[in-house]
């Protein structure tokens, strides 16, 4: 592990001696004539009063902060040739009595003008922050050197240990920023100032139980001691340094706790508990903050987990709204969850956290709790990644939920929520499961590579699934069953290893404006008394049929475009009775609409064209109503009724087919009424032996004045 090693031992040994002498020389210089010393009005804005923070504010000075030794890593590496060219003032100076203010002593003049920058920088490196602020007021040269970036970087890393400047621009907001991306001339100094009011917790820090000599920094060995010290503070900040802290934290105030360590901060600062919830936020923690730590709940053994079904690594109760960021959260309990958010008024912000490798559910949100959950990694948990139940209503954005051993997100028992732009994949069951009156809104998520399916809505589940990408799932992209009634709108549902949308077991639902393509089975499958509304979808390029309605399936199917599928555009079979209106069904590699084995239903006002087989086929007891359709461009005829097919065909336009407009054969008995059959390359109607049927008021073109 990388650590920063500032010369604390040198500072403690030589601080008073160095600074006393430096102040004496500076005092002599400050009393010199105006021709020698800097103007007080130029240097004084560089410092903040010691009564406030003891630190300078670079933003209040218009003088640019230079870094004269940026290329020199230590004073021992000094070489005269490495120095920048610096114009020195004339060596003449007044020799009057310095006590009168009319002259400058040779020693003061040498200190101010002749002593090399590297030597001053080395001297300044032994000073603490408050003393640096003082010497920065002496003159412009001291101000420039005392604000050297490397000087403040070493000072900063010696106290806070971070590899990058950490900024606290507003309550509950802490961000690391690359120095070159900062707007500050000296980002290390600015970060130092923003964090300076913090209280430090460092294990085994025996020599610094209170304030450290020479600086206004408080150290404690336990988090509880730091809490006690901060009791009367407004918005206190506690910095927890590297170590394993086996303690329970109960937070009821607006305190900020943040890990402080080099490298990956959260991995080096660990909060762990074995008996009760490790971190508990209660009422009163409206603007509390916890960041950059690992939070673990580790019961002694598996036998103890029964008593821990309500214990968690992180627990947030009602009427509090803490912010938790950049934390690693683990639980090895086989019951409960790693994170629990429960109760009215529970409204946390959980961002950039990792909730992974837990032996239970990753995150439970329940009992009308809310909250914002953004940019988290939730993975490899033994049960669901997230549970939302009992009318909880969270907002979840840009989370990565993957490789769980159960479902990715499970909404049930009236759970709600808004889920946007989440990446949900490779979970053992569905990516998103909804049941029991749950009603989430899922927008612009990517739900893919599920080991069972993409979205599973069952047992009176609801929900709005809008503009998602649902693809590459092992089973159907969307499952709807058992009186569930979700809205599936403007999604891309593609490349499933089975079907696109599967509605069965009395499923309902509104399926509209989706792009469904490239699935191994039917783009939409409706069966067993299911009755959805399917409209304005594109269903194309499937390896099976476009829409498959069977086993007494129903549904209103309208205004869809179904094309370029490997098998029939629409299959209707086994007692099914859907209604198809105003669809465009075309360019299929087999039949356009295929009724067989007692398939029924209404086919009305559709365009059915350019199929390799017939536009419509009716067989084996099927008895549909086919009305006002345009059926044209078939490579094997317009309508084929055979093997005991029935049906009513009326007011259709059947034209430009390669073979007969209507074929009737093998014991079939359809009714044809007021159809227009024209421009075919064979007969208008072809009737074979054993055929019955009724047709009247038919209109044929000049080519079809005969019925064969």
Question: Model-predicted segments: where are they?
Answer:
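Short, T/G/N/S-enriched strand-turn elements that build extracellular solenoid repeat scaffolds
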Residues: 223-231, 245-252, 279-282
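Acidic Gly/Asp/Thr-rich repetitive segments characteristic of extracellular carbohydrate-active
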Residues: 203-240
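Right-handed parallel beta-helix
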Residues: 294-391, 395, 400-402
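Right-handed parallel beta-helix/beta-spiral solenoid domain characteristic of secreted/periplasmic
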Residues: 207, 215-220, 255-309
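Short glycine/acidic-rich loop motifs that flank beta-strands on beta-rich extracellular proteins
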Residues: 248-250, 275-278, 299-305, 312, ...
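CRL adaptor-proximal regions
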Residues: 1-125, 134, 144-212
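All-beta strand scaffolds that present successive hydrophobic residues in beta-strands
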Residues: 257-258, 288-290, 322-326, 348-351, ...
């Amino acid at each position: 592990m990388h650590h920063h090693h500032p010369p604390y031992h040198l500072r403690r040994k030589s601080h008073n001696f160095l600074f006393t002498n430096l102040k004496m020389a500076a005092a002599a210089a400050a009393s010199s004539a105006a021709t020698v010393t800097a103007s007080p009005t130029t240097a004084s804005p560089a410092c903040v009063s010691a009564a406030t923070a003891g630190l300078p504010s670079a933003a209040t000075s218009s003088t640019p902060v230079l870094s004269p030794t940026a290329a020199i890593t230590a004073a021992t590496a000094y070489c005269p040739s490495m120095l920048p060219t610096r114009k020195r003032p004339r060596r003449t100076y007044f020799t009057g009595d310095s006590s009168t203010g009319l002259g400058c002593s040779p020693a003061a003049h040498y200190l101010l003008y002749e002593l090399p920058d590297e030597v001053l920088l080395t001297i300044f490196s032994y000073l603490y922050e408050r003393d640096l602020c003082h010497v920065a007021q002496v003159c412009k040269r001291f101000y420039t050197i005392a604000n050297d970036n490397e000087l403040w970087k070493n000072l900063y890393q010696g106290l806070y240990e971070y590899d990058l400047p950490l900024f606290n621009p507003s309550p509950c907001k802490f961000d690391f920023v690359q120095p070159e991306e900062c707007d500050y001339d000296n980002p290390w100094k600015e970060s130092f100032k923003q964090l300076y009011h913090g209280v430090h917790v460092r294990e085994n820090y025996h020599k610094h139980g209170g304030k450290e000599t020479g600086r206004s920094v408080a150290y404690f060995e336990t988090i509880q001691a730091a809490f006690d010290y901060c009791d009367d503070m407004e918005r206190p900040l506690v910095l927890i340094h590297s170590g394993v802290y086996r303690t329970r934290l109960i937070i009821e105030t607006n305190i900020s706790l943040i890990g402080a360590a080099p490298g990956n901060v959260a991995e080096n600062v660990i909060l762990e508990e074995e008996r009760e919830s490790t971190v508990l936020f209660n009422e009163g923690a409206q603007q509390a903050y916890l960041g950059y730590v690992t939070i673990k709940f580790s019961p002694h053994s598996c036998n103890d987990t029964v008593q821990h079904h309500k214990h968690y690594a992180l627990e947030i109760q009602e009427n509090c709204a803490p912010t938790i960021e950049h934390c690693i959260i683990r639980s090895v309990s086989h019951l409960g969850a790693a994170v629990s958010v429960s109760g009215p008024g529970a409204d946390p912000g959980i961002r950039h956290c990792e909730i992974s490798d837990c032996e239970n559910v990753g995150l439970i949100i329940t009992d009308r709790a809310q909250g914002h959950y953004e940019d988290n990694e939730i993975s490899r948990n033994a049960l669901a990644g997230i549970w939302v139940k009992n009318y909880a209503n969270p907002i979840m954005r840009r989370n990565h939920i993957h490789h769980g051993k159960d479902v990715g997100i499970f909404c049930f028992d009236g759970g709600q929520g808004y889920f946007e732009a989440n990446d949900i994949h490779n979970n053992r069951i569905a990516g998103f499961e909804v049941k029991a009156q749950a009603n989430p809104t899922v927008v612009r998520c990517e739900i893919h590579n599920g080991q069972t399916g993409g979205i599973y809505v069952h047992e009176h589940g609801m929900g709005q699934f809008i503009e998602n990408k649902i693809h590459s799932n092992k089973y159907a992209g969307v499952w709807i069953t058992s009186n569930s009634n979700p809205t599936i709108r403007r999604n891309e549902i593609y490349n499933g290893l089975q079907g696109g949308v599967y509605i069965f077991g009395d499923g309902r639902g509104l399926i509209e404006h989706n792009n469904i393509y490239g699935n191994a089975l039917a783009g939409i499958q409706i069966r067993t008394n299911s009755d959805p509304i399917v409209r304005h979808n594109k269903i194309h390029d499937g390896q099976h049929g476009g829409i498959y309605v069977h086993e007494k399936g129903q549904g209103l199917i309208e205004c869809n475009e179904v094309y370029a599928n490997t098998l029939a555009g629409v299959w209707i079979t086994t007692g099914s009775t859907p209604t198809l209106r105003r669809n465009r069904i075309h360019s299929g590699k087999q039949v356009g609409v295929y009724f067989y084995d007692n398939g029924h239903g209404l086919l009305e006002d559709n365009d059915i064209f350019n199929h390799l087989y017939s536009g419509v086929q009716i067989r084996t007891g099927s008895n549909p109503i086919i009305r006002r359709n345009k059926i044209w461009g078939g490579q094997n005829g317009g309508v084929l009724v055979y093997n005991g097919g029935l049906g009513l065909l009326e007011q259709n336009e059947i034209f430009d087919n390669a073979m007969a407009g209507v074929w009737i054969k093998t014991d079939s008995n359809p009714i044809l009424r007021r159809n227009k059959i024209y421009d075919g390359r064979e007969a208008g109607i072809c009737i074979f032996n054993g055929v019955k049927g009724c047709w009247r008021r038919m209109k044929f073109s000049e080519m079809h004045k005969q019925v064969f």
